[in-house]
């Protein structure tokens, strides 16, 4: 494929196959390979969190983050947040917190532990106590108002399950959430991987980049965040059709 195409964008491939396919393509091809369900989602999530933290007056480096869903998107989000310098990061799957005492983890989740804080075991309810940020890439209804009440003041919730998020925005705001994002276009702050990948590919193609690195993803997230000059609770992420996105992101993929 490499002689015929300038780059490969992978779409709608579930874990763990997506990890294997992406890694093999990166190894065998000398063109950029990017699974946007993983990395595009992670880039836009980080961009939104950078601005959400500004809205509530917190530093991401001091925040406790709880991530539910350790599949393709969750894995990429965890890795990028850690590389950015997030404070404390716990991941939760269907069996509880991913921790040192778990003996049921597959190879991908075991590798993911390198990016997590794994000294605490228990349930989502245990993990979310004292958290500043909740990120959901799992399924509807997992986050309750009672859980939000256990979070720190001015909690940030990115409930990204589609089409129905882990908690609906109106219910989350009634429970005290300060900044809310979803994966849907009919609510403010849509986390859509289409915000990121066109500009990343434009930059890679224009600049002859053969591998899209973690540094490129971090640069893209920071560039996206910078397009929101004065973040508010209802605007921490640019709109997906913002004409500034592609040239701004492309300029940092060098």
Question: Where do the PLM segments sit?
Answer:
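A cross-family phosphate/adenosyl-ligand binding-site feature
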Residues: 17-29, 36-39, 97-116, 217, ...
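Adenosine-phosphate binding glycine-rich loop
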Residues: 36-37, 56-59, 159-161, 165-254
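Rossmann-like adenosine-cofactor binding region
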Residues: 110-179, 184-186
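Solvent-exposed alpha-helices and their adjacent loops that cap or buttress functional pockets
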Residues: 1-2, 26-27, 56-60, 82-83, ...
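Glycine-rich phosphate/diphosphate-binding loop of Rossmann-like nucleotide-binding domains
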Residues: 43-136
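Glycine/serine-rich phosphate-binding loop and adjoining beta1-alpha1 elements at the start
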Residues: 1-64
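General beta-strand structural signal in soluble alpha/beta enzymes
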Residues: 9-12, 33-36, 91, 135-136, ...
């Amino acid at each position: 494929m490499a002689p015929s195409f300038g780059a490969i964008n992978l779409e709608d491939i579930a874990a763990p196959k997506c990890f294997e396919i992406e890694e093999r393509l990166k190894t065998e091809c000398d063109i950029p390979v990017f699974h946007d369900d993983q990395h595009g989602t992670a880039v836009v999530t980080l961009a939104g969190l950078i601005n959400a933290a500004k809205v509530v007056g917190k530093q991401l480096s001091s925040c406790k983050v709880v991530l539910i869903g350790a599949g393709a998107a969750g894995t990429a989000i965890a890795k990028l947040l850690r590389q950015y310098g997030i404070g404390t990061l716990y991941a939760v799957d269907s069996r509880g917190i991913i921790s040192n005492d778990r003996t049921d983890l597959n190879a991908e989740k075991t590798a993911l532990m390198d990016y997590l804080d794994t000294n605490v075991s228990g349930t989502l309810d245990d993990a979310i106590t004292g958290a500043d940020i909740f990120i959901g890439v799992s399924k509807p209804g997992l986050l309750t108002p009672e859980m939000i009440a256990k979070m720190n003041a001015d909690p940030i919730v990115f409930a990204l399950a589609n089409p129905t998020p882990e908690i609906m925005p109106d219910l989350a705001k009634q429970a005290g959430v300060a900044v809310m994002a979803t994966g849907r276009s009919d609510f403010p702050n849509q986390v859509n991987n289409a915000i990121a990948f066109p500009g990343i590919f434009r930059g890679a193609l224009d600049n002859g980049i053969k591998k899209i690195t973690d540094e490129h993803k971090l640069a893209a997230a920071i560039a996206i965040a910078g397009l929101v000059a004065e973040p508010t609770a209802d605007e921490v992420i640019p709109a997906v059709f913002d004409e500034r996105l592609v040239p701004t992101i492309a300029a940092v993929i060098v």
